[in-house]
Amino acid sequence: MAATLSVEPTGRSCWDEPLSIAVRGLAPEQPVTLRSVLRDEKGALFRAHARYRADSHGELDLARVPALGGSFSGLEPMGLLWAMEPDRPFWRLIKRDVQTPFLVELEVLDGHEPDGGRRLARTVHERHFMAPGVRRVPVREGRVRATLFLPPGQGPFPGIIDVYGVGGGLLEYRAGLVAGHGFATLALAFYDFEDLPKELNVIEVDYFEEAVRYMLRHPKVKGPDIGLLGLSLGADVCLIMASFLNNVSATVSINGSAFSGNRHIKYKQTMIPPLGHDLRRMKVAFSGILDIVDIRNDAVGGCENPSMIPIEKAKGPILFVAGQDDHCWRSELYTQIASDRLQAHGKERPQVLSYPGTGHYIEPPYFPMCPASLHKIVNEAVIWGGEVKAHSKAQIDAWKQILFFFGKHLGSTHSRASCRL
């Protein structure tokens, strides 16, 4: 009897969906190696492997049988995805074209040899970033450069603006996934994209106000308020929007700092000075890669520092997500300062998700952790922190909590079906 490799859902799934992976038709107690391969849009290969032993019936269910070693060990049904590593140094997995899936090749190899034995079974699974029925709408409205993702159905839907960080450009993959959970989600560029400024010297809040107005005017977006979701500098942009603009009722800050870091923040007559940094405080980590965690100037005065974003002005609740091992900056410390500021101004203590062993790039579930990559400011590779397994668990939990937070405060009751057609 030939071995068969099955993946559920069959054929395709959304990237944030868990998979059930099983092998049948093996010999009792047969040692095998499972291997996964993904090629990104720039040609880089991401790989993982794990050694297993079939049960007495010649079957292997990754939800019931622990890995004996390899890229991971223990009971990790999704380890073949989150434990992937790139074949290029300092390379981060990013999906550029959300209209096409990533193809994940899964193989079963005989034995536990490091280079792999005879191939016993193989399958290819599509991992999509838009659930069936989600619509992608490019937005070039006034100055706004963005992409709107609309859930299936008539709507109107609760709205979210999604902002990424210091890399600039327009990243759509998180917004596409969020839309699959019932939210009209705008992936918003704010520099280094098309005719937007190439460099971000001043954060002009007027631009983001225009994006909020666009969302609230859209017939498929349910007002009167929207939510905001941001990572890193994008998280700080979201905190700025929540502090200065009306019609924001829920904000999620993923490893934000709540400070004006290297740029002035300008809104009408208000100007917030940057905290600034000193590159002489860079260190070299044990790995030989630069560590920039301490280059920012000290937040003298704590929550009353003049470079802090006035988050006490935010109308709605803020969910802070922090990696305790973030090496971009000290997210856990900044989150505590932000909490102190809110409470000092008579606000309730905010909800904080603080994850041990978790680095800077907290992505949707099952994205491989990026331990180090090129940083736009220092123009060299820097470490981002995190331990692979802990970081992966944090991504899964944070995603569930973020979706629940938006559902609670924006009024969505949507529950997404599988990505299968």
UniProtKB/Swiss-Prot annotation:
Residue ranges crossing the lipid bilayer per the database entry: none
Induction: In the liver, by peroxisome proliferator (Clofibrate) treatment, via the peroxisome proliferator-activated receptors (PPARs) or fasting for 24 hours.
Gene3D superfamilies to which the protein is assigned, alphabetical: Acyl-CoA thioester hydrolase/BAAT N-terminal domain (2.60.40.2240), alpha/beta hydrolase (3.40.50.1820)
Keyword check for Nucleotide-binding: no
GO biological process: acyl-CoA metabolic process; dicarboxylic acid catabolic process; dicarboxylic acid metabolic process; long-chain fatty acid metabolic process; saturated monocarboxylic acid metabolic process; short-chain fatty acid metabolic process; succinyl-CoA metabolic process; unsaturated monocarboxylic acid metabolic process
Keyword Transmembrane attached: no
SUPFAM superfamilies membership: alpha/beta-Hydrolases
Gene source species: Mus musculus
Top-level taxonomy: Eukaryota, Metazoa, Chordata, Craniata, Vertebrata
Subcellular location: Peroxisome
Annotated positions of the N6-succinyllysine modification: 313
Catalytic residue list: 232, 326, 360
Primary localization class, coarse: other
A single Gene Ontology CC term: peroxisome
Catalytic activity: succinyl-CoA + H2O = succinate + CoA + H(+); glutaryl-CoA + H2O = glutarate + CoA + H(+)
Keyword terms: Fatty acid metabolism, Hydrolase, Lipid metabolism, Peroxisome, Serine esterase
Motif Microbody targeting signal: chain residues: 419-421
InterPro entries (UniProt xref): AB_hydrolase_fold, Acyl-CoA_thioEstase_long-chain, BAAT_C, Thio_Ohase/aa_AcTrfase, Thio_Ohase/BAAT_N
Annotated tissue distribution: Mainly expressed in liver and kidney. Weakly expressed in other tissues including intestine, adrenal gland and adipose tissues.
Protein name per the record: Peroxisomal succinyl-coenzyme A thioesterase
EC code(s) of this entry: 3.1.2.3
Function: Catalyzes the hydrolysis of acyl-CoAs into free fatty acids and coenzyme A (CoASH), regulating their respective intracellular levels. In contrast to its human ortholog, functions essentially as a succinyl-CoA thioesterase with no activity with medium to long chain saturated acyl-CoAs and with a low activity toward glutaryl-CoA.
MF term (GO), any: fatty acyl-CoA hydrolase activity
Record family assignment: Belongs to the C/M/P thioester hydrolase family.
Pathways involved: Lipid metabolism; fatty acid metabolism
